[in-house]
Amino acid sequence: MEETVTVDLSNTYLHYAERTMRQNGLTGREHHYVRADVMRWISDMRQTRDRWDLIFCDPPTFSNSSKMGRRTWDVQRDHAELIIGMSRLLTREGEAIFSCNLRTFKPDIEKMARAGVVLTDITAQTIPEDFARNQRIHHCYIVRRYTVDEAMRLSGLE
């Protein structure tokens, strides 16, 4: 592992992340904790050459934090913009994992495919045995980039 970057608006959650990393032996200057609106951070990072092999994204279902200015966050409404943006931060062979807790979540497959992004649903593989009777505790996807034509074909939209 070369480096990790944790981005969150909340100092509390950044401290939780740092403590969890430390408990797992992941300490040092290669681990960064950034207090920022992730959508703005993604936009800023797209202007750099920094790219990642793996991105893990677990956004809140909803947020109206004053730290976001006038915007609110709604995972159903805003997920495609987030996923497309973070896909642009992946290396060529990179993957992202997108997880959300909205039980009624429906990804906008067409919007993402038109941007060259394909989701592979891995939810069933991420549900602990303790929750076998209630499979709707979250949704989880692998995110990969393709050409738009490939993404449309792989998404069944050609």
Residues covered by each model-derived region:
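Mobile active-site "lid"/loop adjacent to the S-adenosyl-L-methionine
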Residues: 11-13, 35, 52-85
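A structural micro-motif
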Residues: 2, 29-31, 94, 117
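S-adenosyl-L-methionine
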Residues: 10-54
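Conserved SAM-binding motif I beta-strand of class I
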Residues: 3-8
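Short amphipathic alpha-helical segments
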Residues: 18, 46-47, 67-70, 109-111
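Helix-to-beta-strand junctions that scaffold the AdoMet/dcAdoMet cofactor pocket
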Residues: 90-91
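Aromatic-residue hotspot detector
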Residues: 21, 39, 62, 131-132
